[in-house]
Amino acid sequence: MTDGGSDTHVDDAAGDGGRVKREARVTETPESPYPTDDPVLARIGDTPLIEYPESTDGGDLFLKLESDNPTGSMKDRLALGIVRELEADGRLTDGDVVVEASSGNTAGAISLVTNRLGYDSVLTVPAGTSPQKIGYVRSFGSEIAECPNVDADDERHYRKTAERIAAERDGIWIDQYSNQLNPTVHYEWTGPELWDQAAGDLTHVVCPMGTGGTASGIAKFLTERKPDVRVVGVDAEESNISTAFYGTESGAYDTEVEGLGKGHELPTMWFEYVDEVRSVDDERAFVQARRAAAECGVLVGGSSGAAIAVARDIARDRPDAKIVVIGCDSGDQYFDTVFDDAWMRERGYPTDDR
């Protein structure tokens, strides 16, 4: 695999501790489809594609580090891309309020982007959202509306509340769960960027699925560019993305891996372009994320851990494979969960991975 025409060199000599020395990889990527003069927002995208620094005993494994975005996740692309698209078609103008329902990475991304572009924003969050997450979003100046934990069809639910606030304040509700701009941003941006970095030399892309927008957009782009590249979505074991994909009976939605899985299919999941969906249980996702940090110096969250686990399975079965994993976010948000031994032991998960 080459990056923007530059050769990849791997030193055959092992360094300290038997690890293989690798030279830095230089990449050239296309310009962002959502250009900005803001120096902070200009850092969104063009994230590095690195060779995963651990043997897979099979195919080659690469990791796209979306953690290099300003708020540490791929949701920065979503936020900037959707806001720019809304501005371009006149649906978002000066003085408008941007509203979204999220307590995770999207909340931080929306808060940052609206802050830098001069829009007010309101984030609705479910009760029990950690003070750290609320504080992070507020640090960029967003309003927070905390909502009770009720059924999704209850008017007090945090998504219903976001929709209502947007209507009352004549604002824009981003609605990442059904907004077709979600996968479109990745079709226009992440897919082409990945293709150029890999110089088209890849056999698989493995991507965690929450809203499904990233996997769907990348899959559509690759289907048009090189149809034999397989895009593999990754679902939580106790989730219903895979059951919706394969048309099998759905079950309960119960996972502790943030940003992975959903209780049902969403409009942002373009299944017609995705080749397969594999499920990973919470324990394996967390253990793989911890291994990535301890053994490889790569700090990612549980959803990326799940994707790395799937990619390693593919690599073992396909020695000729060249697999890109989308690393959705940084692990620095999970020091009190995934990387906390006490938290892991309370749930019966092993901690001898490091």
Q: Where are the regions a protein language model picked out?
A:
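PLP-dependent amino-acid enzyme catalytic core
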Residues: T2-R354
